[in-house]
Design a protein with these regions (language model features):
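N-terminal amphipathic/basic leader segments beginning at the initiator methionine
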Residues: 1-21
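A diffuse structural propensity rather than consistent per-protein peaks
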Residues: 3, 69, 165, 266-273
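Short, surface-exposed alpha-helical recognition segments that flank or form part
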Residues: 6, 10, 43, 172-175, ...
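Mg2+-dependent prenyl diphosphate-binding active-site environment of isoprenoid biosynthetic enzymes
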Residues: 16-17, 23-257
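Gly/Pro-rich interdomain helix-loop hinge
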Residues: 252-266, 271-279, 283
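Conserved small/polar residues in nucleotide/adenosyl-binding loops
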Residues: 285-292
Length: 292
């Protein structure tokens, strides 16, 4: 079985350089802001996006050229800090108290401060990119911010209208997850001077990984515990219709579907409805749908 550590191994040295780079560039004056920023940076998870940048750069660098240079570290930083800011904003929107097994930024410092520190990270990130003079990298990455916002609005609209379809679900996870991972892969290629054709291939590869990653993550939300860093059934509590529940809704009749949707609407207030839907999904849903 291929593990994340095995995938990470070829760029371990570059990842260490990236950590030093990001810590050096993201500092702040003021005790509260500095504390919040350090807290956000210390719980960034597995680092899938910067690792993707570095692996793509290593794959596409010309023979004899160092793939982990300043442009590559900058590209990795740009995508990672967009991701960090988006998670802070997501937790505010979803009123989530936990992030990766500990209190979220909004739970610890209130939502009003969390929104500002998320904005600060985005502003600091763009300032870093522009001052570097690497305008091609900044332009390449910036579009992902708008795409993330589009995905969030679409998800909220579909949830409020109870109109989630498989097509809209796939569109949402592309915009909220796969797009930035795709940009990470293509940014790594761009950083080392790869052709546009290779950049496009790397982006498609990254997007495919991102789609698979998010589908698996949505499945795990019905089974994992807080030990893994996110409460089980969190999507239900936030009224999010992801692939497991969507598959069940597609498989039942209209009357039964309305009943399940009514249960979903009460999940934020009722643990009983959460447990009921979790049981139904686990009973009727199999990993065959994810494979499809």
């Amino acid at each position: 079985m291929v593990t994340l550590d095995m995938i990470r191994k070829p760029v371990e040295g570059d990842l260490e350089a990236f950590e030093q780079f990001i810590r050096q560039k993201f500092t702040a004056d003021g005790t509260l802001l500095s504390e919040m920023l350090d807290y956000a940076l210390s719980a960034r998870g597995k680092g899938i996006r910067p690792m993707t940048v570095l692996l793509s750069a290593a794959l596409n660098a010309p023979a004899g050229q160092r793939s982990g240079g300043l442009r590559t570290l900058l590209a990795a930083t740009l995508v990672e800090m967009i991701h960090v800011a988006s998670l802070i904003h997501d937790d505010v929107i979803d009123e989530s108290d936990m992030r990766r097994g500990r209190a979220s930024v909004n739970a610890r410092w209130q939502s009003r401060n969390a929104v500002v520190v998320g904005d600060y990270i985005l502003a600091k990130n763009m300032d870093l990119g522009l001052k570097s003079g690497q305008f091609d990298l900044v332009t390449h990455v910036c579009g992902a911010i708008a795409t993330l916002c589009e995905g969030e609005i679409l998800q909220n609209d579909k949830a409020n209208r109870q109109e989630m379809t498989r097509a809209s679900y796939l569109d949402i996870i592309y915009k909220k997850t796969a797009c930035l991972i795709g940009v990470s892969a293509s940014a790594g290629a761009l950083a080392v001077g790869a052709s546009r054709e290779k950049q496009a291939l790397m982006r498609k590869f990254g997007e495919s990984i991102g789609m698979a990653f998010q589908i698996q993550d949505d499945i795990l939300d019905y089974t994992r515990t807080a030990r893994t860093g996110k409460p089980s059934n969190n999507d239900l509590r936030e009224h999010k219709v992801t692939l497991p529940l969507l598959t069940v809704l597609e498989s039942v009749g209209e009357e039964r579907r309305r009943e399940l949707q009514a249960r979903l609407a009460r999940c934020h207030e009722e643990d009983e409805s959460v447990e009921y839907l979790q049981h139904i999904v686990c009973l009727l849903y199999t990993s065959d749908a994810a494979d499809e």
